[in-house]
Amino acid sequence: MFVRIVKMRFQEDKINLFLENFEAVKHHIRNFEGNQFLELYQDKNDKCIFFTYSFWDNEESLENYRNSDLFKEVWDYTKALFSAKPEAWSVDKVVSLA
């Protein structure tokens, strides 16, 4: 299992469009084979910055998602709303405390 973090900066007047679309597709993303967890965060100081935080079984699962029709549809819509190039990291969890 690993964590995928994606940072996105949106045009301020496009934030609501992004949130509406995310609401419509979030369960499809979460239920994609290999996805264990999905969260969306908004920066406290800059409302144009959002992060997705997702857990994936393995890199193959993430690649299957990234090559899926679902991803293509979501990403094509979402990237038109950006005000800056997105950034993404695949990371291994080292320590987790609850």
Residue ranges and their predicted role:
Residues F10-E12, N58, D92-V95:
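Non-catalytic surface loops within mature trypsin-like serine protease
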Residues I15-L17, I49, S61, L97:
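Intrinsically disordered, low-complexity acidic/polar segments
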Residues M1-R4, E23, E63, D76, ...:
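Short alpha-helical segments used as structural interaction elements across diverse proteins
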Residues E39-D46, D76-A98:
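Glycine-rich beta-strand-turn "strand-cap" elements at beta-sheet edges
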Residues E12-F37, L70-W75:
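Short amphipathic alpha-helical segments
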Residues R30-E33, D57, S83:
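Short conserved AdoMet
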